[in-house]
Swiss-Prot record:
Superkingdom of origin organism: Eukaryota
Gene Ontology BP annotations: cellular response to ionizing radiation; DNA repair; DNA replication checkpoint signaling; mitotic intra-S DNA damage checkpoint signaling
Source species taxonomy: Eukaryota, Metazoa, Chordata, Craniata, Vertebrata
Gene source species: Homo sapiens (Human)
Disulfide cross-links: none
Protein name per UniProt: Cell cycle checkpoint control protein RAD9B
Gene label: RAD9B
């Protein structure tokens, strides 16, 4: 159950959050908890995630409670609100925010779980009331698993400075490249798009390190990501008047755009384009190279004992196995140092995995796809599981080769001897 009341100025901030999330996905989740009301969304390709958390003190009145259902074995079962709304149904309600801020005295939002409806009521001056009944779909919200605090590069800048910079880019711009050094910050058009002769405009914007509230660069980095999500969080940050924090590592690793405020907290996690140079120098690539060296050594030793014909027969009949097989706990802990995360699911199971969150995107001879985004997979989580974590947005889910997770992405399987490598192409 959810009940909350907002004033006119608070409705404007809430509407800006809805508009920012609409740049990511066509649907979003209402996820109330004792920490506040969270709005979450994930795009269809699982390469972008957005979450805005409104603390209880943001609202004039905030009430949330979980339903308790008695089971046959006399054990209480806590049922949390599973509410997924279509963006097309709720976005027109918060379209004219300036008019709503001037004319609305208060806004009331509550849920009717028995009828699967979210009710939004606007109370205008002179006793006028407008009510919207929106049907929702019962669906478990998703939460990304990504620890932004361990990123090598961290920036903090006022949103107005960054908003003035993106004015230089055209409306048709799909991707931008962020290049940083210990002294400079450069935001420019994507290199791939600049090669297109139909797009004659190439923009670059340089900002000195003294213009930032916080500027920490651990290594020179150049990453490429989608431009649409950046514009969305900039619009929202201008409404909250809070600085934007940017966390990132090398290409292929996710980029985090965050707003931390006493009343509102926002996190946008974006996938970045991976290149050959970054994959060769990444910790995952080091692990893969060591793995290949060991497999090559085993094959050389095996070649001394069996004939080439026997090897060919074995390679044809050998069943494909995962790139990282089940190993001892010491091997798993060693791979965790290479950036292996965990994935949370709805039943509360948290499984350790030995694969990196960045998918293996090695070049395939003859492949027509030259640009690859690292794909992010997500596990469904319930509100009660958030209590086991220090932060609601602290980690990014791993890439999985399970049959269920592979339905939303286009995957190729490459066999090399007895090893099977999975990689996602977006």
């Amino acid at each position: 159950m959810l009940k909350c009341v907002m004033s006119g100025s608070q409705v404007k901030v809430f509407g800006k959050a809805v508009q920012a999330l609409s740049r990511i996905s066509d649907e979003f989740w209402l996820d109330p908890s004792k920490k506040g009301l969270a709005l979450r969304c994930v795009n269809s390709s699982r390469s972008a995630y957005g979450c805005v958390l409104f603390s209880p003190v943001f609202f004039q009145h905030y009430q949330w409670s979980a339903l308790v259902k008695m089971s046959e074995n006399e054990l209480d079962t806590t049922l949390h609100l599973k509410c997924k709304l279509g963006m097309k149904s709720i976005l027109p309600i918060f379209r004219c925010l300036n008019s709503l801020e001037r004319n609305i005295e208060k806004c009331r939002i509550f849920t009717r779980s028995d009828k699967c409806k979210v009710v939004i009521q606007f109370f205008y001056r002179h006793g006028i009331k407008r009510t919207h009944n929106i049907c929702f779909q019962e669906s478990q919200p998703l939460q990304v698993i990504f620890d932004k605090n361990v990123c090598t590069n961290t920036l903090m800048i006022q949103p107005r400075l960054l908003a003035d910079a993106i004015v230089l880019f055209t409306s048709s711009q799909e991707e931008v490249t962020l290049a940083v050094t210990p002294l400079n910050f450069c935001l420019k058009s994507s290199n791939e798009e600049s090669m297109d002769l139909s797009n004659a405009v190439h923009s670059e914007m340089f900002v000195g390190s003294d213009e930032f509230d916080f500027f920490q660069i651990g290594m020179d980095t150049e990453i490429t990501f989608c431009f649409k999500e950046l514009k969305g969080i900039l619009t929202f940050s201008e409404a909250t008047h809070a600085p934007i924090s940017i966390y990132f590592d090398f290409p292929g690793k996710p980029l985090a755009l965050s707003i931390d405020d006493m009343l509102v907290e926002a996190n946008f996690i974006l996938a970045t384009l991976a290149d050959e140079q970054s994959r060769a120098s990444s910790p995952q690539s080091l692990c893969l190279s060591q793995k290949r060296k060991r497999s090559d050594l085993i094959e050389k030793k095996a070649g001394k004992n069996v004939t080439g014909q026997a090897l060919e027969c074995i390679s044809k009949k050998a069943a494909p196995r995962r790139l990282y097989p089940k190993e001892t706990l010491t091997n798993i802990s060693a791979l965790e140092n290479c950036g292996s995360p965990a994935m949370k699911r709805v039943d509360g199971d948290v499984s350790e995995v030995s694969e990196s969150s960045v998918s293996n995107t090695e070049e395939v001879p003859g492949s027509l796809c030259l640009r690859k985004f690292s794909c992010m997979f997500f596990g469904a989580v319930s509100s009660d599981q958030q209590e086991h974590f220090n932060h609601p947005f602290d980690s990014l889910a791993r890439a999985s080769d399970s049959e269920e997770d592979m339905n939303n992405v286009c995957c190729r399987k490459e066999f090399n001897g007895s090893d099977a490598k999975y990689f996602c192409i977006i």
